[in-house]
Regions:
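Positively charged n-region of N-terminal signal peptides that target proteins for export
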Residues: 1-4
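Bacterial N-terminal signal peptides
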Residues: 8-19
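Compact, glycine-rich, soluble single-domain proteins
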Residues: 25-156
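Sec/Tat signal peptide C-region and signal peptidase I cleavage site
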Residues: 21-23
Length: 156
């Protein structure tokens, strides 16, 4: 009987550990994660796992209270139709890059290295369909710039 307890215990510890890692970042487990790719003007491809904020509640919360975002992670805000977008960093302890994306998946503007906890309004500057938030400074590090293309089902 004891030899069956150890594997069961290991499975429970593993599941709880993975659950804790998900919650440690602060992103609610109910937010779906989808693959996303950015293709630069030079043809470089960068893959990400993007949390999808596609409800009023998930867009309002965004990455508030999130303490860690891995380099290959981001959050994609879907605003459903193109319009001017205004964001802020209230209750957000991370510095982020905000990539404003039009309905064709083209990055129109990047607000780099936002200031954590700031209530200063960050505007899209034009009509956009979505905003992708990445760790602050990552866009520059990867050579991502306005004019690059985001590959995701929202822009098909």
């Amino acid at each position: 009987m004891r030899r069956y307890l150890l594997p069961g215990f290991c499975v429970i510890v593993l599941v709880l550990g993975l659950h804790t890692m998900t919650l440690a970042s602060g992103v609610p487990a109910s937010i779906p994660v989808e693959p996303l790719e950015i293709v630069t003007a030079g043809g470089e491809r960068h893959a990400f796992a993007a949390y999808l904020a596609d409800t009023p509640e998930s867009r309002a919360r965004g990455l508030m209270y999130v303490t860690r975002l891995e380099p290959g992670q981001g959050m994609l805000f879907d605003f459903e139709s193109p319009r001017p977008i205004h964001m802020w960093m209230k209750n957000t302890p991370l510095s982020l890059d905000m990539l404003f994306i039009d309905e064709d998946g083209v990055i129109t503007r990047i607000e780099a290295r936002t200031r954590p906890f700031s209530t200063e309004i960050i505007s899209s500057g034009s009509d956009v369909r979505a905003v992708l938030e990445l760790n602050g400074g990552l866009a520059e590090k990867l050579g991502i710039a306005a004019g690059d293309r985001v590959i995701h089902r929202l822009f098909d």
